[in-house]
Amino acid sequence: MKILAMDERREELSAKSTVQNVKISEAPILDGKVNNEDSHMEIDQPEGSMEEDDHRQVKEKNTSENSVEQKRGRRMFGALLGTLGKFQQESEREQKSARKVKRAELEEKLAKRREQELQELEKQEKIEAEILESRLQEQRKVALDELELDRNDLKKVLDNKKSYYLRTKTQPSLFYRPYYLLPSQRTQLEQMKSEAP
C-alpha cells in the first residue's frame, strides 16, 4: 500500500515537471491504431524522463486494466448479490407460505378441538339437565307421596273425630253433639266409631 502511494506521488510530480508542451497532429487511424508516419509529437522533456514515462504508461495501463477488472468484479458481485437476494426472497416466500400452511393447520386443529369441547360441554349439560330433571321428578314424587300420606292421616284423624259427632241429613252436612244424648243417638255414635278406621 505504501509503495503504491509513493509511486503515484512520484508520477504526479514528474508529470507536472516534464510535460509542458505536447502537440499531436491529426493522424489517420487505421484499425484503431494511430499511423506513426503522419503524426508527430513534440515534447519538451529533460533527459532521463523516458523511464519515468514508460513506468507511468505501464502504471496507467495496469490501473486501467485494474479499473476494468474492478468494474467487472463489481458487476459480477452485483449479479451474485441479486441472485442471492432472489433466492433469499424465494426462501422467505416459501417460509411464509410454510408458516401460513402451519398456521392454517394449527387453526384448523384448534377449531376442531373447540368444536369437540363444545360438543362435550353440550353433552355434559344435557346429562346434567337430565340428572336434574330426574331429581326434580323424584322430589315431586316424594312430595306428592308425603302429601298423600298427610292427607290420609288427616282423613283418619277427621274420620275419627267425626265419629264423636252426629251429622244432619241435609246438605251440606252439619256435625253436632248434643249435651244430653238420646239412646238412639248413642247407638248411632257407637256404630260410627266401629266403622271409623
From Swiss-Prot:
One of its GO terms (cellular component) is cytosol. Pfam families: Pinin_SDK_memA. Its main location: nucleus. Residues 30-73 are annotated as: Disordered. It comes from the Eukaryota. GO terms for biological process: mRNA processing; nuclear mRNA surveillance of spliceosomal pre-mRNA splicing; RNA splicing. Keywords: Cytoplasm, mRNA processing, mRNA splicing, Nucleus, Transcription, Transcription regulation. It is found in: Nucleus; Cytoplasm. Residues 34-43, 53-71 have a biased composition (Basic and acidic residues). Transcriptional activator that may participate in the regulation of mRNA splicing. Belongs to the pinin family. This is Pinin homolog 1. The gene is pnn1.
